[in-house]
């Protein structure tokens, strides 16, 4: 009984973990004649007790208080990307304790080498049982997610075949899934962590992409955008750092807003350079000097016009040219498809002396974009073309 209790407290489920934790005790138990059967029985009993009586916070939250958290790698990654570590830690703690109800998923989004997989891998390996989503196998994608403490969805995509089951799992609902060579099994509410550099709210159906499930999927997630690349010697997040981070979060809990985008703030800014570090710029000879563009008309910043951005432009504050993928991602929220924003001042200019009112048109037929969106626009050139009557055309007469 003492051995099983020790295995449960340490979260040990295999002989390899036992050797790594306490090699001397493993050798002493392995020295007896019937040791193999005792070791196997103890590990099996410990696994059953953990799966039935323990949850993820029992192994994610450390026992000892943390005095200095500034050297923690998870803390550094969040601070580097502009997040308030205390607020972000409260999001992670509430996610692990299933405090947010339907919002049961943390989505770490960003390009490669930004630390998203580093964080997710460390959290998954800290708990005794975690499952991985095999999105490449559309018949049994959640085969490994039954009776787990944490579910990890690594670099996946959302397809039309699995979206309904995925919404139930991401929302913390009980759902039965098919298993290979077995009968269907029930997945209980389990915290889910997703890492990807693609849009997980866009559903791929063959060679087409739809956004009809975007809002339901966003209602089930907290999204962290990690855009700052880490140094090559940054290192891996350890299990102890995960426990220290969650323990620090438990001791410094703040109120969390239930919203898709986790708000940023509280990051440290780099100090301004001193006068001694600023050198006088070199003068360009008049014969090769180019005209300055400061007096020219400012170019359009498309970064301000896109509410949702693709993986190539998610961290950009300045976009000089439009993006076709960003246009598609904003079609369900923007009216002006030419510039990608709702209130386009170029298409609908407003003067203080003589404001211009937008003329609303009534359409009997809608273009394919507004037909999919299910909204009637105030004005749309594509809808104008659809509603043209060829009998009224001079050339047809």
Curated annotation (Swiss-Prot):
GO biological process: DNA replication; viral genome replication
Domain of life: Viruses
GO molecular function annotations of the record: ATP binding
A Gene Ontology cellular-component term: host cell nucleus
Annotated ranges, domain SF3 helicase: 84-239
Keywords in alphabetical order: ATP-binding, DNA replication, Host nucleus, Nucleotide-binding
Binding site for ATP: 110-117
Pfam families according to UniProt: Parvo_NS1
Region (Disordered): 265-296
Compartments it resides in: Host nucleus
Known function: Plays a critical role during packaging of viral DNA into empty capsids, where they are thought to be part of the packaging motor complex. The single stranded genomic DNA is packaged in a 3' to 5' direction and requires the association between viral DNA and Rep40. Regulates host PKA activity by interacting with host PRKX as a mechanism to interfere with helper virus propagation and to promote its own replication.
Assembly: Homooligomer. Interacts with host PRKX.
Name by which UniProt lists this protein: Protein Rep52
Organism (species): Adeno-associated virus 2 (isolate Srivastava/1982)
Source lineage: Viruses, Monodnaviria, Shotokuvirae, Cossaviricota, Quintoviricetes
Gene giving rise to this polypeptide: Rep52
